């Protein structure tokens, strides 16, 4: 299995300009749920090219973006400099070992990343540790629409991006968040319709991987096709599919 560091260092330039990541529909929902305040000290975990951090920066006191991929951080710093955003800092570090003291932040966010985390329970524990009492944690991530197709979804995602680990259901997220000590405040489904050709290009898929994805979709049963919203052209090729996304606000 490829590491997230390798995958995103390789594709950093594409992610910096990707409209899905830079301004996709989960971003305004995340910002609204976060209810940013001018006094907030914010941590953006797995910041990537800094899209969430740089959106929040004008609304808060300070934002730190954390990521394991140095090329992604370089893109974030370049954008901050180009846009003259001065209250951000981008640092290297793991979501499962956050390099900051206890109760350092009033708001933690993470967008389009936890499906890469092997130890989600450790990530949740670390977020709770660095949050101040009463602090907010807002996360947006891909989910599996139901437990019955979870295995198919993960195989599909991993074929496209070997650094993918697992897309959990909303029920699994609720259980793990509760165990970690969070209060579940609100959640909202934000489905994305993704063009297949764009999706495979974004990950740098090989021809073999694209063929395997076409085969998986072509042989999927009706339940999978319906829940994933897979659309085909007249030749049987994939046009697009629905990527189920959840945005949730938790509080310490």
Where are these regions (language model features)?
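Conserved Class I S-adenosyl-L-methionine
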Residues: 49, 184-252
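A short SAM/SAH-binding and catalytic strip from SAM-dependent methyltransferases
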Residues: 106-119
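A short glycine-rich, Lys/Arg-flanked "PGG" loop and its adjoining helix->strand segment in the class I
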Residues: 121-136
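Conserved class I S-adenosyl-L-methionine
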Residues: 1-37, 51-55, 72-75, 138-161, 198
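A short acidic, Gly/Pro-enriched loop at the edge of an enzyme's catalytic core
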Residues: 96-107
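Short alpha-helix
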Residues: 166-180
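Class I SAM-dependent methyltransferase SAM/SAH-binding core
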Residues: 41-45, 49-97
């Amino acid at each position: 299995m490829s590491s997230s560091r390798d995958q995103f260092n390789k594709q950093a330039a594409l992610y910096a300009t990707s409209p899905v990541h830079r301004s996709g529909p989960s971003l305004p929902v995340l910002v609204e749920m976060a209810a940013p305040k001018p006094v907030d000290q914010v941590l953006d975990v797995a910041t990537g090219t800094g899209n969430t951090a740089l959106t929040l920066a004008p609304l808060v006191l300070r934002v730190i973006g954390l990521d394991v991929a140095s090329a992604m951080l370089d893109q974030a710093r370049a954008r901050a400099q180009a846009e003259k955003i001065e209250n951000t800092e981008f640092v290297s570090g793991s979501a499962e070992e956050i390099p900051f003291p206890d109760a350092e932040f009033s708001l933690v966010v993470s967008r389009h990343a936890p499906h890469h985390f092997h130890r989600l329970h450790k990530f949740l524990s670390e977020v709770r540790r660095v949050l101040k009492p009463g602090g907010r944690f807002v996360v947006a991530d891909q989910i599996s629409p139901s437990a019955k197709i979870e295995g198919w979804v993960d195989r599909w995602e991993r074929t496209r991006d070997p650094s993918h680990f697992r897309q959990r259901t909303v029920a699994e997220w609720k259980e793990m968040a509760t165990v970690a000590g969070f209060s579940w405040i609100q959640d909202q489904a934000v489905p994305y319709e993704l063009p297949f050709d764009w999706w495979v290009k974004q990950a740098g898929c090989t021809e073999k991987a694209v063929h395997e994805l076409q085969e998986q979709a072509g042989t999927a049963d009706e339940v999978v096709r319906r829940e994933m919203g897979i659309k085909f052209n007249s030749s049987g090729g994939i046009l697009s599919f629905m990527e189920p996304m959840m945005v949730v606000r938790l509080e310490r």
